[in-house]
Amino acid sequence: MQYKTKAKKSLGQNFLQDENIIRKIVQLANIKKHDIVIEIGPGLGALTRYLLSSSNNVSVVEFDASVIDTLIANCQKYGTPHIYNQDFLKFDISSLENSSNQKIKLIGNLPYNISSPILFKVIKDSDKIVDAHFMLQKEVVERIVSLPNSKSYGRLSVILQYHFDCSMILKIPPEVFYPQPKVDSAILRLKPKNSKELLKNYNFFEEIVKQSFAQRRKTLHNNLKSILKERKIDPSTLPVDTNLRAENLSVGDFVSLANFLS
């Protein structure tokens, strides 16, 4: 592996370089020869090499043009990925040549500074994917997989758990990266749910969740006061107890609340 390229702090780059960890990630992602794989932010190709050894159809989306020559050189012995030099947030997954309409496996060491926008984009593309395996800050993964009544349970937990079965499958120490980040990392697995509770208005559901967690220490009654007043709704008629805080409600509770208020 060549590591000639200096990591760019502005892009949140931390290059993975531990071969054992990389092999473990690919193994956990259960990638087969026939799978269509998209890697987000391949960097210098440490993970890409192993993906090319596992699948016949690997595409990479890399925003930083300066790493692409090194990426190609590092992958040469393993194969050639389809390279898209663009921002994943603007990337159209359906633009991939895929005559069989086969669903896609997403994988990547996500830049810390834009991990949340990427996750919200993946929500929009959830009908096109089999699963996703992302390396993120461990703290972020813990928030995503958190259950109600915990301090780390929040907006990200509710929204992602509505769409996916979410699990933390591997913890990763800082020492396996170049340069070393100041935080621990973890692998998040997202598997789209086969069936989701029906929502009357998804955008309104997102807004209710956002408002409910706006001030964590306040009750739902206080956080949703303006919405309840605008709709002239008596809080006692709601399907949830508004004296609770948002962190006490399950994903299903938020669905019921949003549907009632829609």
Curated annotation (Swiss-Prot):
Key words of the record: Cytoplasm, Methyltransferase, RNA-binding, rRNA processing, S-adenosyl-L-methionine, Transferase
InterPro entries the UniProt entry points to: KsgA/Erm, rRNA_Ade_diMease-like_C, rRNA_Ade_Mease_Trfase_CS, rRNA_Ade_methylase_Trfase_N, rRNA_adenine_dimethylase, SAM-dependent_MTases_sf
Annotated S-S bridges: none
Gene3D superfamilies referenced in this protein's UniProt entry, alphabetically: Ribosomal RNA adenine dimethylase-like, domain 2 (1.10.8.100), Vaccinia Virus protein VP39 (3.40.50.150)
Predominant localisation class: cytoplasm
One Pfam family matching this protein: RrnaAD
Catalysis performed (reactions): adenosine(1518)/adenosine(1519) in 16S rRNA + 4 S-adenosyl-L-methionine = N(6)-dimethyladenosine(1518)/N(6)-dimethyladenosine(1519) in 16S rRNA + 4 S-adenosyl-L-homocysteine + 4 H(+)
GO molecular function list: 16S rRNA (adenine(1518)-N(6)/adenine(1519)-N(6))-dimethyltransferase activity; RNA binding
One GO CC term, this protein: cytosol
Functional description taken from the UniProt entry: Specifically dimethylates two adjacent adenosines (A1518 and A1519) in the loop of a conserved hairpin near the 3'-end of 16S rRNA in the 30S particle. May play a critical role in biogenesis of 30S subunits.
Protein name: Ribosomal RNA small subunit methyltransferase A
Species this chain originates from: Francisella tularensis subsp. novicida (strain U112)
